[in-house]
Amino acid sequence: QAGGIGYGKADQALKDKPKPGDKIVILGGENYRIGMGGAAVSSSDTGEFASGIELNAVQRSNPEMQKRAANAIRGMIESDENFIVSIHDHGAGGHLNCLSELVEDTGGIIDLDKLPVGDPTLSDKEIIGNESQERMGLVISEKHIDTLQRIAERERSPMYTVGDVTGNDRFTFESKTKGNKPMDLDMEDMFGSSPKTIMTDKTIVRHYSDIVYDKDKFYDYLDQLLQLEAVGCKDWLTNKVDRCVGGKVAKQQCAGPLQLPLNNLGVMALDYKGKEGIATSIGHSPISGLINPVAGSRNSITEALTNIMWAPLKDELKSVSLSANWMWPCNNEGEDARLYKAVEGISEFAISLGINVPTGKDSLSMKQKYKDEEVISPGTVIISAAGHCNDVKKVVEP
């Protein structure tokens, strides 16, 4: 399980409203033919599209560039005054998604010629819509551009001033060298006017045989159990990496003199001297979810909570927030109905516990197509729990 954990300051959490004349800036790498249509392809069956389309939709990472851009932003945050008006990451849709959301309430114009291009064969559509990772878009007033520029140069983060906030409620990409406007739309055409999606599916009731246990077949059962990846996977032996990068890892997955991966949760300290930190855990239950999607969802939350409970949480359950990652083979008969029940089940269960689920992710293409057959994955929700730990030295280990 790879991921990150951290915290944000409350006074940095709310964005300001961009004003006409403010500058639109990009921090990070160049545009390449990467992640074109990634959002659509990621929610379609593997093998549904031609290999060229699927290859162009694949995302590539550039962690070095990510670190440079993050350090530049961190430099602004840790200054006496943070001059960033608004900020947005580049995800699916690339510049189109990121930059339009920055100026959603005002409008803006982007100079296509100033967007960094690493591949000269890109079309205007590909420059605007590619999902090259490790880029951030932000709005900053013109008088503070030099400050950001100096910080970016210090951190070796590429920085590009690519446009202006206009206040005309239009979003425009314009190339002065070509004399064309690949995109010029009213903001109301882009936000809040899309039709509602209506999904139709039917519930399929599946019946399973009762569990039959024969003690004489114990070793056969054990052999089958150890074939499960969640039980017998040996990645922890081969993936030997430094799990204490940065020096704030208070609890990682391995424990004891043999360093077996038995810990129920991870804990990151907030600083180098204090005892407070952030605890995190995960939970999933694909097998029970196959039989009953509501039970599978509730079990995922339950596992995450019974894992994180071994850390002293400052406000007990009120300290915990959940993230739901939906791994589901949608658009297959009965699966949309199962997903609806699973989402409803998580919502009702979390509300009854007084826990929020403020964020999440989905991968709805959990299906592999072959020439003569198809294989779908069991619909699963993976729950990540995080909470305020008030003493990183009192976490219980197995």
Model-derived features: where do they sit?
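Glycine/proline-enriched, intrinsically flexible loops and inter-domain linkers
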Residues: 1-398
